[in-house]
């Protein structure tokens, strides 16, 4: 398996909106390469005799009845909030750019 390049790490950092120094690019490339090699080894395991599962242990009766129980009113839920608007928590905007681009 080919090693992950510094350019690929820089691209992933940009997509993740992470500020990464040149020194960190090299370190991260090495670390990600080790992770990818481990994932490749897992993919090589022959498991034809093992049935596919969604959990490592069997799960039964994991759902509970949907019972209406007392809960907080909107006013009670928002009472400790620093800012609220129209019965909703109001938080500062974190994205200053158009998400579609």
Curated annotation (Swiss-Prot):
Instruction: Name the InterPro entries for this protein.
Output: Asp/Glu-ADT_sf_sub_c, GatC
Gene Ontology MF term list: asparaginyl-tRNA synthase (glutamine-hydrolyzing) activity; ATP binding; glutaminyl-tRNA synthase (glutamine-hydrolyzing) activity
UniProt keyword list: ATP-binding, Ligase, Nucleotide-binding, Protein biosynthesis
Q: Which domain of life is it from?
A: Bacteria
- Which spans are transmembrane here? none
Swiss-Prot/TrEMBL catalytic activity: L-glutamyl-tRNA(Gln) + L-glutamine + ATP + H2O = L-glutaminyl-tRNA(Gln) + L-glutamate + ADP + phosphate + H(+); L-aspartyl-tRNA(Asn) + L-glutamine + ATP + H2O = L-asparaginyl-tRNA(Asn) + L-glutamate + ADP + phosphate + 2 H(+)
Query: Looking at the record, which segments are called Disordered?
Result: 75-101
In terms of Gene3D superfamilies, this protein maps to:
Glu-tRNAGln amidotransferase C subunit, N-terminal domain
Keyword check for S-adenosyl-L-methionine:
no
- UniProt record, GO biological process: regulation of translational fidelity; translation
Feature: compositional bias, Basic and acidic residues: 85-101
Q: What is its EC number?
A: 6.3.5.-
Assembly, in brief, is: Heterotrimer of A, B and C subunits.
HAMAP family, alphabetized: GatC (MF_00122)
Q: What does this protein do?
A: Allows the formation of correctly charged Asn-tRNA(Asn) or Gln-tRNA(Gln) through the transamidation of misacylated Asp-tRNA(Asn) or Glu-tRNA(Gln) in organisms which lack either or both of asparaginyl-tRNA or glutaminyl-tRNA synthetases. The reaction takes place in the presence of glutamine and ATP through an activated phospho-Asp-tRNA(Asn) or phospho-Glu-tRNA(Gln).
Similarity comment text for this entry: Belongs to the GatC family.
User: Under which name does UniProt file this protein?
Assistant: Aspartyl/glutamyl-tRNA(Asn/Gln) amidotransferase subunit C
**Source organism of this protein record:** Salinispora arenicola (strain CNS-205)
Tell me what gene encodes this. Answer: gatC
């Amino acid at each position: 398996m080919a090693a992950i390049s510094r350019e690929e790490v820089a691209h992933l950092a940009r997509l993740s909106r992470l500020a990464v120094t040149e020194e960190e690019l090299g370190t991260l490339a090495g670390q990600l390469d080790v992770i990818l090699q481990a994932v490749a080894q897992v993919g090589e395991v022959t498991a034809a005799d093992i049935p596919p599962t969604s959990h490592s242990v069997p799960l039964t009766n994991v759902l509970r009845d949907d019972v209406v129980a007392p809960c907080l009113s909107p006013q009670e839920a928002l009472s400790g909030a620093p800012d609220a608007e129209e019965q909703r928590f109001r938080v500062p905007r974190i994205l200053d750019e158009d998400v579609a681009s």
